[in-house]
């Protein structure tokens, strides 16, 4: 929309993942006629961080390139073209521009721009340097601005670490438009949400363990009280609020996998917490799974039916995943990152035709010493 309003010609769209690149390209194609585009990305350039959503370029189902000469030819020959690229591959675009006669961009769009903020990296900060990527205008967009505190900036300066701050107007410019969650909800752009804190105390757990021998049902694996409380809290929220589609977030990939493997077994071992006749299906995804396996699990959340579907992950579903059918998310393990929390919440407040609220489930284990 903004490209059309500005009547921009040559445009660069930067995104942090191949998955989000693919989604964005499809949206642009559906809304544009005669769009001339090229995708710049490389498997080698994609970060392999903890549970990042990693997709092989060959799995995108579209033509991609990492050839600088091909990128350069596109820049010269397609004055109204659009280059879609990951931030990680943006140095290839800069290299293609670094020749006489290669035009600058009319517009550069940096999506999920909070990923640029922080410690400067060669790839992600490339777009901030007009000597590398030449452009008339730059537009940065994010749902979760990442503002560095004075203490963090001072420490970085003391350690001679270059940082990019979103509040630095010389890098990111002025704020053009801001829309917060509450206003978006009031304008019916997002659905409202409700935070559900589910407390489970120690006597509840101990009495059920004694009565039902939960430990022995788990093939000899010992399960601590906190983990048991998390399972009970989730099942209680699902039953109390009639939830059908739920994503759980965990500290790590192993914890997410274990939760998926044992959830139904644990819950159904507790007389008072059992799902009873309810059909409950669990699944698990992580960043380095084959894309076909991941997509199967995601698509299950988008099907209609009365069965309960729970999909566990560490963080690969936090950013750039659109599942309007989602009823709830559950933070099974505590989260400290404000950006990670906001991104995860963003998954459950997407509107659909029948959803009035999204639910954010926070299990709380109350041990013997807690009230």
Question: Whereabouts are the PLM-identified features?
Answer:
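A short beta-strand-to-loop transition that corresponds to the Sensor-1 phosphate-sensing loop
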Residues: 17, 84-89, 112, 141-145, ...
């Amino acid at each position: 929309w903004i490209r059309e309003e500005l009547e921009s010609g040559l445009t660069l769209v930067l995104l942090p993942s191949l998955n989000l690149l693919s989604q964005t390209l499809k949206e642009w194609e559906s809304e544009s006629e005669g769009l001339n585009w090229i995708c710049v990305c490389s498997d080698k350039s994609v970060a392999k961080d903890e549970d990042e959503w990693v997709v092989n370029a060959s799995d995108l189902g579209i033509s991609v390139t990492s050839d600088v000469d091909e990128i350069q030819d596109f820049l010269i020959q397609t004055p109204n073209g659009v280059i879609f690229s990951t931030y990680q591959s943006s140095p290839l675009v800069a290299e293609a521009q670094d020749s006489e006669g290669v035009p600058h961009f009319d517009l550069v769009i940096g999506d999920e721009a909070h990923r640029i903020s922080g410690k400067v990296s060669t790839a992600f900060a490339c777009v901030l340097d007009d000597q590398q990527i030449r452009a008339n205008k730059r537009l940065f967009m994010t749902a979760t601005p990442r503002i560095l505190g004075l203490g963090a900036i001072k420490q970085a300066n003391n350690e001679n670490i270059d940082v990019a701050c979103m509040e630095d107007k010389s890098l990111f410019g002025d704020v053009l438009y801001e829309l917060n969650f509450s206003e978006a909800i009031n304008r019916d752009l997002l659905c409202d949400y409700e935070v559900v804190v589910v407390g489970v105390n120690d006597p509840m757990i101990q009495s059920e363990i004694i009565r039902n021998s939960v430990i022995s049902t788990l093939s000899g694996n010992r399960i601590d009280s906190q983990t048991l409380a998390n399972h009970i809290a989730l099942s209680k929220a699902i039953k109390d609020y009639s939830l059908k589609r739920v994503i759980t977030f965990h500290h790590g990939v192993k914890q997410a996998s274990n939760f998926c493997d044992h959830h139904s077994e644990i819950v159904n071992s507790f007389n008072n917490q059992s799902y009873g006749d309810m059909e409950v299906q669990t699944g698990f995804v992580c960043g380095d799974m084959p894309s076909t396996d991941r997509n199967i699990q995601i698509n299950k959340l988008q099907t209609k039916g009365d069965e309960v579907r729970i999909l566990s992950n560490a963080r690969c579903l936090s950013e750039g995943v659109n599942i309007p059918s989602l009823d709830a998310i559950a933070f099974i393990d505590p989260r400290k990152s404000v950006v990670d929390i906001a991104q995860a919440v963003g998954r459950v407040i997407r509107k659909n035709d029948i959803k009035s609220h999204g639910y954010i489930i926070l299990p709380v284990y109350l041990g013997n010493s807690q009230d």
